[in-house]
Amino acid sequence: MRSYPAIPRIYAETTLNMLLKRAKKPRVHSIDEYLKDGGYQALEKALNMSPEEIIDWVDKSTLRGRGGAGFPTGKKWKFAVQNPGPRYFICNADESEPGTFKDRIIIERDPHLLIEGIIISSYAIGANEAYIYIRGEYPAGYYILRDAIEEAKKKGFLGKNILGSGFDLEIYVARGAGAYICGEETALIESLEGKRGHPRLKPPYPVQKGLWGKPTVVNNVETIANVPFIISMGWEEYRYIGPSDYAGPKLFPVSGKVKKPGVYELPMNTTLREVIFKYAGGTLGNKKVKAVFSGALDCFSSEELDIPMDYSPLGFGGTGTVIVLTEEDDIVEAALKIAEFYEHETCGQCTPCRVGCYEQANLLEKIYKGEATEQDWEGFDFVNRNIQPTSICGLGAVAGRLIRQTLEKFPEEWEKYRKKSASLPL
């Protein structure tokens, strides 16, 4: 393999030695290193199983999508195979949410784990073509994956009649152009087809009508990387990792005001407090935690640090992204950064999200600068409440959520800004 100097030195730590087993150091692992460590043995085992059996194992493992929604992976695969082929498999590597860099570490350091997972997943759903849609800002990852695919072909793990099984598969890598919205599965499919990355109305869902109008499974990088372990260990043993209903390893990218930012591989019965203080070393300067942002999705206060890092109704959920804010941070300023992110990333397809995200950020900036009138405050509240119920896709559905949560959990901080602008005329 060639040298990839652009690989960042992200700190990685694991208590499970699974997804991050070979990803602790910032370098690419070749196929020979992967094979020495038992790589592609899960594929050999899978090709001696029926596709139906593999889907059943993944379903029984309780593996959930690691891209944010937490939908049961086995159920998604079952829905796909109910529809006649040809079928397609897509790896969603368009990781673009604030503070999220967990998939990157697999792509850039252990690409063959991902490729093995894609081959097994494609075999299970009966797909002969698979696509990796990678974020445009990951140039090293793009070339690493292309080289790794060529390595796998030379060893007989890709192409025609893989390992003499009669199963054929080609994997193609496509680069995004920096649009966060293309992480939404239907917008991703539109982009792959050469169209503008706009989400589709659902139903039909991609498992019914996806790429080129055919049944398509879209799974996240981390989700796919779990598949070889389910096959090699067996679903029963896999379910012993973490809580039985939310089994398997989970990657948590941690950033913000912590001593050891990085990616941590932990079971999902770990608490948010443990992630911050036991693994990430606590806060900088030992300051008090004010809030934790789950990427740009949710806001948790310091009173909620004992929640589990799982997908239960009271769990942390999402992508597992942890952004720590301390008592030194301004919650309104942080909320403004989130509003600006959504303003920049809305695709503009539907009016509620296009106009709503712009107005939300514009009015919030006026609030932050102390220039908001009472009408501005009322307008901000109205816009924030109405983006979600009237938007087409998930981006609009969550564009105001974290900001609303800061209003509810930190009313005293917002009140300070309200008092600043109380003397302004209407």
Swiss-Prot record:
Positions annotated to bind [4Fe-4S] cluster: 347, 350, 353, 393
Cofactor(s) for this UniProt protein: FMN; [4Fe-4S] cluster
Keyword Metal-binding belongs to the record: yes
Record's keyword annotation contains Transferase: no
Record's catalysed reaction(s): a quinone + NADH + 5 H(+)(in) = a quinol + NAD(+) + 4 H(+)(out)
Listed EC numbers: 7.1.1.-
Keyword terms: 4Fe-4S, Flavoprotein, FMN, Iron, Iron-sulfur, Metal-binding, NAD, Quinone, Translocase
SMART domains per record: NADH_4Fe-4S (SM00928)
EC class name: translocase
Binding site for NAD(+): 65-74
NCBIfam families: PRK13596.1
Binding locations of FMN: 176-223
Function field: NDH-1 shuttles electrons from NADH, via FMN and iron-sulfur (Fe-S) centers, to quinones in the respiratory chain. Couples the redox reaction to proton translocation (for every two electrons transferred, four hydrogen ions are translocated across the cytoplasmic membrane), and thus conserves the redox energy in a proton gradient.
Family indicated by similarity: Belongs to the complex I 51 kDa subunit family.
Gene Ontology MF: a single term: quinone binding
Entry's cofactor comment: Binds 1 FMN. Binds 1 [4Fe-4S] cluster.
Record's protein name: NADH-quinone oxidoreductase subunit F
